[in-house]
């Protein structure tokens, strides 16, 4: 299970504030609200906003660290969702890597990642290949899990040192290629494991 970044008392106060605010502005009674964890919310909007109801659908979420977790696998079947795997933010840190590279490239983390993604296609293979190899040495897919080859003590300083002197577009291109390959390999493994080929995805990493 994931780690909580707030105490139980903090979470209780936050929920009370949310309910009170919505009651005051919309007039919906508080007893009609049901709180769900971050990845359940991601999975729900991905599945229930999709056209898939008959048969089984894989519902995959990937993001930074919502409620202490960074990825989940669920199965949607006949309008119902069942969580079958959760991955902690300590084990899946692709979003954090993307965040740090955004910062290293002089942009605003948690806001300008889309600019890094937009910059990536401008780099040709001979430009991004060195950066790509740096990222490949970090995390890899092992079945349905993500693992570090050799976990750096500090990801930001690790990449700052390893990527020094490389072109900015090459860094963006290498990062995007690495992330796409990593996630595609994981998705293929999930499909192979459960035999379900219909997929919906949600979360910041798959945006």
Positions of predicted regions on the chain:
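Active-site pocket-lining segments that scaffold enzyme catalytic pockets across diverse folds
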Residues: 46-52, 185-190, 205
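A short helix-loop
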Residues: 54-58, 62-169, 173
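Conserved phosphate-binding catalytic cores of ATP/NTP-utilizing and phosphoryl-transfer enzymes
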Residues: 35-59
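Glycine-rich phosphate-binding loops at beta-strand->alpha-helix junctions
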Residues: 198-207
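Phosphate/ATP-binding catalytic cores across multiple sugar-kinase/actin-like superfamilies
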Residues: 173-197
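Short acidic-aromatic active-site loops that bind/stabilize oxyanions
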Residues: 7-12, 33-36, 165-181
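Glycine-rich phosphate-binding loop and adjoining helix at the ATP-binding site
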Residues: 2-44
């Amino acid at each position: 299970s994931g780690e909580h970044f707030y105490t139980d008392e903090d979470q209780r106060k936050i929920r009370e504030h949310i309910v009170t605010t919505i009651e005051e502005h919309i007039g919906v009674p508080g007893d009609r609200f049901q709180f769900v964890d971050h990845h359940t919310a991601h999975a729900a909007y991905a599945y229930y906003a999709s056209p898939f109801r008959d048969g089984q659908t894989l519902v995959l979420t990937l993001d930074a660290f919502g409620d202490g977790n960074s990825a989940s696998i669920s199965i949607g079947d006949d309008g119902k969702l069942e969580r079958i795997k959760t991955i902690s933010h300590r084990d899946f840190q692709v979003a954090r890597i993307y965040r740090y590279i955004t910062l290293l490239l002089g942009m605003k983390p948690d806001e300008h990642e889309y600019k890094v993604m937009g910059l990536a296609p401008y780099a040709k293979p001979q430009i991004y290949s060195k950066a790509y190899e740096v990222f490949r040495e970090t995390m890899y897919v092992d079945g349905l899990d993500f693992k570090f080859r050799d976990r750096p003590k500090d990801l930001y300083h690790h990449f700052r040192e390893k990527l020094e002197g490389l072109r900015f577009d090459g860094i963006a291109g290498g990062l995007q290629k690495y992330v796409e390959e990593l996630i595609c390999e994981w998705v293929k493994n999930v499909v192979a494991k459960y035999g379900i080929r219909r997929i919906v995805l949600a979360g910041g990493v798959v945006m």
